[in-house]
Amino acid sequence: LLCGALVFLLPMFARIINAGNLLGLGLCLGGFLLWCFKTPLHQWYIAHGEQLWFRITSRTVLGLCLLGVLLAVGLTGGMLYGAYGKRTQNADVAIVLGCKVNGTRPSIMLQQRLDAAYAYWTEHPDCLLVVSGGKGSNEDISEAACMYQYLTEKGVPADRILQEDRSTSTRENLRFSKELLVEQGCMPKEIALVTNEFHQLRASMIAKDCGWTVSSIPAHTQPWLIPTYWVREWLGILHHTLLGTE
């Protein structure tokens, strides 16, 4: 439990606080409290274990816990398939989904996406890169401008990059990028999404909502960030599935 709590606490020292590490810490705290009060809980179970209401309640709680575990396993499997089961081999357009910019430089997560896009482009230099992301309230430049700057500094020719700088969500990333490609008269045979592996499944689900069938170019997430972002993505996928929103 202590190790689990540390795993979710570590990103907070880098000012990364989201539903993923908050839920993870909450589960660790719940487990710690159960361990602390295991003796009185056991005594309570002995005293009330044969009563009908207790049996119904305890079995319901255990059933919900089991359902949660199965759901987490299923979502993780789906996320892995979304990232690696649909990996592209020959996409002629790659859309790099934006992420936080620190000042004018990419955040850790955005740099990972850009490095994945660059690695793919070096093997497929005819591929057109679409960098998609608007300017957040705490960002000095748009995510698209930041990505364009990073990729051109690494040697990608400017004419192989299109900038979409209006979007504020994954859905807008895809919708505005599609409009930009149409404006440019580009009719790609295959479109791949460049984003972190945990985000590929939900991004492809949103793309399907927009009428696209896409493949993936997964960016690897640093190990110390995996628990926080994968747990957050479980919630994101459930939210999208149940409510149809991001």
Indicate where each model-derived feature is located.
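Low-complexity, intrinsically disordered/propeptide-like segments
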Residues: 25, 183, 245-246
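A transmembrane-helix-recognition feature enriched in membrane-embedded lipid enzymes
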Residues: 226-246
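Membrane-embedded alpha-helical segments of integral membrane proteins
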Residues: 1-46
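Membrane-interfacial, low-structure loops and terminal tails that flank and connect transmembrane helices
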Residues: 43-56
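Structural signature of transmembrane alpha-helix termini at the membrane-water interface
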Residues: 10-13, 40, 70-77, 81, ...
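Internal/C-terminal transmembrane anchor helices
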Residues: 53-78
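A structural signal for short, hydrophobic/glycine-enriched beta-strand patches
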Residues: 74-232
